[in-house]
Amino acid sequence: MVGGGGKRRPGGEGPQCEKTTDVKKSKFCEADVSSDLRKEVENHYKLSLPEDFYHFWKFCEELDPEKPSDSLSASLGLQLVGPYDILAGKHKTKKKSTGLNFNLHWRFYYDPPEFQTIIIGDNKTQYHMGYFRDSPDEFPVYVGINEAKKNCIIVPNGDNVFAAVKLFLTKKLREITDKKKINLLKNIDEKLTEAARELGYSLEQRTVKMKQRDKKVVTKTFHGAGLVVPVDKNDVGYRELPETDADLKRICKTIVEAASDEERLKAFAPIQEMMTFVQFANDECDYGMGLELGMDLFCYGSHYFHKVAGQLLPLAYNLLKRNLFAEIIEEHLANRSQENIDQLAA
């Protein structure tokens, strides 16, 4: 069911509130955000959000009760966006909020459907953080970072938003020399570290849970975040592309740089051949192959590949029963833009 709550795996991943050594006694602590507001966020996005999303909002409310979304802008240059806009009630001030497309709200040029932006940073590089989930009916596997003006690479930065912001803050502290600014950041760092500790969130860049996911990744793809698709004991679910990543990038480069349409058509031949292989793979339930080729072409970024990516990706997502991702990629390819990604902007 799309939008249904992904089940938490047992194993004490959830934050624990009570400071106690007896694990049985420690209770999972929910953030103080009303169920109506939670429903509103999840209905707009058709995705379940993890508890750290709501806990971080409460943390930012403590920093700035008036404008939690901007509580980190002066100090870190970070702003809470995306689903946080709903918690802030920004969608209600927008006149045409009914026609708002949250599938595209803060969806940057290279963001695959698996990526959901929650925090933005430096506009010059289009730095942003987002939850990365392998399937729409699961909770995120980590918080990823991308700088859309630079490339399509997604860098995993912890499995919760506290970790992602802490890692960002630590890097920032190493870069600045202004004493006043250093003290301000250290103050936020202490508060954030304490809040994460009390709630039981890991501040590691790569947690055990993330390393376990790494083992399930069938292929890295151009964005580096990797694809996870179900593969059964007979190895049905994924088959490799006949070209290496380096070769595929070379093929893409030749297509994009072709001097004429005729040359471009010729250069497309290896892609056409791979699409035939994908059809065979789909017939034999190796749906991961089409997902990989489509994702690589999407990540390459050129509009010359939009049509092919638009054929491969929605089909792959639907075959994998990740229907919401199929919907997102179709809408994104139809409105793929390097600017104008804030759907709430006037």
Swiss-Prot record:
Keywords carried by this UniProt record: Acetylation, ADP-ribosylation, Chromosome, DNA damage, DNA repair, Nucleus
Active site residues of this protein: 284 (proton donor)
Q: Which Gene Ontology cellular component annotation is one that this UniProt entry carries?
A: nucleus
Q: What is the effect of changing residue 268 to S?
A: Promotes auto-ADP-ribosylation of PARP1. Abolished interaction with PARP1
Modification PolyADP-ribosyl aspartic acid, positions: 235
Identify the stretch(es) annotated as Interaction with PARP1. 242-346
Where does it reside? Chromosome; Nucleus
Q: Which family does it belong to?
A: Belongs to the HPF1 family.
Protein's recorded name: Histone PARylation factor 1
Species assigned in the record: Homo sapiens
